[in-house]
Swiss-Prot record:
Protein name per the record: Undecaprenyl-diphosphatase
Biological function: Catalyzes the dephosphorylation of undecaprenyl diphosphate (UPP). Confers resistance to bacitracin.
Membrane-crossing segments per the record: 44-64, 85-105, 109-129, 185-205, 215-235, 250-270
Organism: Acidovorax ebreus (strain TPSY) (Diaphorobacter sp. (strain TPSY))
Enzyme Commission code: 3.6.1.27
Membrane topology listed for this record: Multi-pass membrane protein
Upper lineage: Bacteria, Pseudomonadati, Pseudomonadota, Betaproteobacteria, Burkholderiales
Other information: Bacitracin is thought to be involved in the inhibition of peptidoglycan synthesis by sequestering undecaprenyl diphosphate, thereby reducing the pool of lipid carrier available.
Amino acid sequence: MDTLLLLKAAIMGVVEGLTEFLPISSTGHLILAGSLLGFDDAKAKVFDIAIQTGAIFAVILVYWQRIRATLVALPTERQARRFALNVLIGFLPAVLLGLLLGKAIKAHLFTPVVVASTFILGGFVILWAERRQQAAVRIHAVDDMTPLDALKVGLVQCLAMVPGTSRSGATIIGGMLLGLSRKAATDYSFFLAIPTLIGAGVYSLYKERALLSAADIPLFAVGLVFSFISAWLCVRWLLRYISSHSFVPFAWYRIAFGLVVLVTAWSGLVTWAE
């Protein structure tokens, strides 16, 4: 396989890993990177879905102690069952809405104006959430969440179906607006990512299975490995970062990136559509 193509796969894997769990929309960055690299044909979109697997494995590894302890304790401990139930409740709204409206949303909302608007609006929402965070925290740990809290965050996660929103951005910032601390919202967002990304990935790959080929295994493997490594580093860094910093820098980054979307769309440099 072409070495240059493998290098592009590695770069795309790094982009996926670094942006999947930050509140800045991995999809927007993958579209931009793919366009600049000339890695944006139909098979590239399947590749983008597949390399999410690496990012998912990274989160599982970071939280493995908690995940393992929960699985072991499920038959005997009420707290473990409540935690698992909260993740399930948060996961279900996106499943239902995705099956009902996923195709329509992609067909009608994937435009430069929508993508740019959601990037910019999301930035201002982060600024607002951070201002409220100082006085509105009522939940300091994931274990303190109720099923109703989980449902509310799950409903907010549905907003991530609008292109440019960011799944992690919707769940983290939505959680903060609903009263979760910055750490609790981030932890729950990561736990919620595991079933959400696995479910979306399996469903999307099944739909696009005709584009899959054994000859592409090296390409996908390179992207997955680099996605895993960069996501693992990014998640660990973010968990340390939020202990003493806010999400305000990400807000300004989103606003700037939204302007980049508009400029690249109007200039014809990038096709912001799927």
